[in-house]
């Protein structure tokens, strides 16, 4: 049923994620070309020659989950890897939720997970709270991490795998004149000796992975195009111990046009504090007003708290028009891989970084050959086939359920259904479409229609009162 697909896509994928643990080349040693004399075909005969006396050299710009995962995969696959990250202690206004499958797929140690959330409350505009974790099994949870901890761990792991990690700011790149000439990167390196100004340097590389976030300079350098973006605003609040006990394994999501006209507000638990935040695409200038409303909705539960950090950052709303150019590819937020409605981005960032790196490792035969755009395009094709439908469906979901407070009330009402919860959590936790029941799918469709009808009736009554 279309409704079920929409709900499954809210936090999940349309097919299972599989991981490759070994990097084995599948590129044949010789290429058989059609006997056609066209200038476009000639390049195939010279694409990806063997590299003499050196390994393929790849720069990863940005050291978040996408960059860290990409750098580790490249280094393990025999690629000479350089990772450039501007802020080694970067904190980001990110809820920090990761699905259970990410812990296993990326072999994350449990000590970097601050909280294991097993209970979630979805709170409607009229403050009706629905518990949406009732179907979780005993071993299942949503991991809560701090980005500065997760990012540092992934960078450290990449370095241990053989990547060179540079504390630096990427400035620009000079594109090669020839198809196999190097890219020249211009960057400022900070070594603790030159102060805040740093030292300007250059570097030549064979390929570039842009993992430098929503304001990606790598994206600008390949004319990747613009996209809609949300402003996320978050305050980290240290609350009294007795208040923190309430949030020990609980996260809250608030919907309503007071907290955001097109997103939601959240209270997510961290190690010794809570993260309270919201976001919006359409009313960025009002973000502080929405943040205040989010705090007010949760005020009784965070009473006595002290704000210890304030964070704001742009978050992309859909993939960029262009994510690849020759030997440059975008991943993570730089590519626009954040889902609407849920705002999930950490898993998709790390996954895209790994997938892009795997394509380079395979195409280069573990660093022995030059790569071309065709090798990187395999990453995009695989990504789009697996994940792009999720982004498209979530666009529709946001338009249907986030368009008005009555529609949000209907959405929260629908979330009270245990079948909806089971399908949603199975999809989110494991990034797969869980097998459903045809009978339950029919019931769900009927209930969804009923919720929307009631929402529209409520909207009409509100409009009458406002006349």
Swiss-Prot record:
Domain of life: Eukaryota
Biochemical pathway: Porphyrin-containing compound metabolism; chlorophyll biosynthesis; Cofactor biosynthesis; tocopherol biosynthesis
A Pfam family the protein falls into: FAD_binding_3
GO BP annotations, alphabetical order: chlorophyll biosynthetic process; photosynthesis; vitamin E biosynthetic process
Catalytic activity entry: phytyl diphosphate + 3 NADP(+) = geranylgeranyl diphosphate + 3 NADPH + 3 H(+)
Chief subcellular location: plastid
An annotated Gene Ontology molecular function: geranylgeranyl reductase activity
Sections of the chain in a coiled coil: none
Location within or outside the cell: Plastid, Chloroplast membrane
InterPro entries: BchP_ChlP_pln/prok, FAD-bd, FAD/NAD-bd_sf, Geranylgeranyl_Rdtase_fam, Geranylgeranyl_Rdtase_pln/cyn, Geranylgeranyl_reductase
Keywords: Chlorophyll biosynthesis, Chloroplast, Membrane, NADP, Oxidoreductase, Photosynthesis, Plastid, Transit peptide
Enzyme's top EC category: oxidoreductase
EC number: 1.3.1.83
GO cellular component: chloroplast; chloroplast envelope; chloroplast membrane; chloroplast thylakoid; chloroplast thylakoid membrane; mitochondrion
Transit peptide: 1-43
Classification via NCBIfam families: BchP-ChlP, ChlP, GG-red-SF
Family: Belongs to the geranylgeranyl reductase family. ChlP subfamily.
Binding partners and assembly: Part of the FLU-containing chloroplast membrane complex composed of FLU, CRD1, PORB, PORC, CHLP and HEMA1.
Function: Catalyzes the reduction of geranylgeranyl diphosphate to phytyl diphosphate, providing phytol for both tocopherol and chlorophyll synthesis.
Protein name: Geranylgeranyl diphosphate reductase, chloroplastic
Annotated organism of origin: Arabidopsis thaliana
Biological classification of the source: Eukaryota, Viridiplantae, Streptophyta, Embryophyta, Tracheophyta
């Amino acid at each position: 049923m279309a409704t079920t697909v929409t709900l499954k896509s809210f936090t999940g994928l349309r097919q299972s994620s599989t991981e490759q643990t070994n990097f084995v080349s599948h590129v044949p040693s010789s290429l058989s070309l059609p006997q056609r004399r066209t200038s476009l075909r000639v390049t195939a005969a010279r694409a990806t020659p063997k590299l003499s006396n050196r390994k393929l050299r790849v720069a990863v710009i940005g050291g978040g989950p996408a960059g860290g995962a990409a750098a580790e995969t490249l280094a393990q696959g025999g690629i000479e890897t350089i990772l450039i990250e501007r802020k080694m202690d970067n904190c980001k206004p990110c809820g920090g939720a990761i699905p259970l499958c990410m812990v296993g797929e990326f072999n994350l140690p449990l000590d970097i997970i601050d909280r294991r959330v097993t209970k979630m409350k979805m709170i409607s505009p009229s403050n009706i709270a629905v518990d949406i974790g009732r179907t979780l099994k005993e071993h299942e949870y949503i991991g809560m991490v701090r980005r500065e901890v997760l990012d540092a761990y992934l960078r450290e792991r990449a370095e241990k795998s053989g990547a060179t990690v540079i504390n630096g700011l990427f400035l620009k790149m000079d594109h090669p004149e020839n198809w196999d000439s190097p890219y020249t990167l211009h960057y400022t390196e900070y070594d603790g000796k030159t102060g805040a100004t740093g030292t300007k340097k250059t570097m030549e590389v064979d390929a570039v992975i842009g993992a430098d976030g929503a304001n990606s300079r790598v994206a600008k350098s390949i004319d990747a195009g613009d996209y809609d973006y949300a402003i996320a605003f978050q305050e980290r609040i240290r609350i009294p111990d007795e208040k923190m006990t309430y949030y020990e394994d609980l996260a809250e999501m608030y919907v309503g046009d007071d907290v955001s006209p097109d997103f939601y507000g959240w209270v997510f638990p961290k190690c010794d504090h809570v993260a309270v935040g919201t976001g919006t695409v359409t009313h960025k200038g009002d973000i502080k007003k929405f943040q205040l409303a989010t705090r007010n909705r949760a005020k009784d539960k965070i009473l006595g708290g002290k704000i210890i950090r304030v964070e704001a950052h742009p978050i992309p709303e859909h993939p960029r028009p262009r994510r690849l150019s020759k030997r440059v590819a975008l991943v993570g937020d730089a590519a626009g891989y954040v889902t609407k409605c849920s705002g999930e981005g950490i898993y998709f960032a790390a996954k895209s970084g790994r997938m892009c790196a795997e394509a380079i490792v395979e195409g280069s035969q573990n660093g022995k050959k030059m790569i071309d755009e065709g090798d990187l395009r395999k990453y995009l094709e695989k990504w789009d086939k697996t994940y792009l439908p999720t982004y498209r469906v979530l666009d529709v979901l946001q338009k249907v359920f986030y368009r008005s407070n009555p529609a949000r009330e209907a959405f929260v009402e629908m979330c009270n259904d245990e079948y909806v919860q089971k399908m949603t959590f199975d999809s989110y936790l494991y990034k797969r479409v869980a097998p459903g029941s045809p009978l339950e799918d029919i019931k769900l469709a009927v209930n969804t229609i009923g919720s929307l009808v009631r929402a529209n009736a409520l909207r009409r009554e509100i409009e009458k009162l406002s006349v």
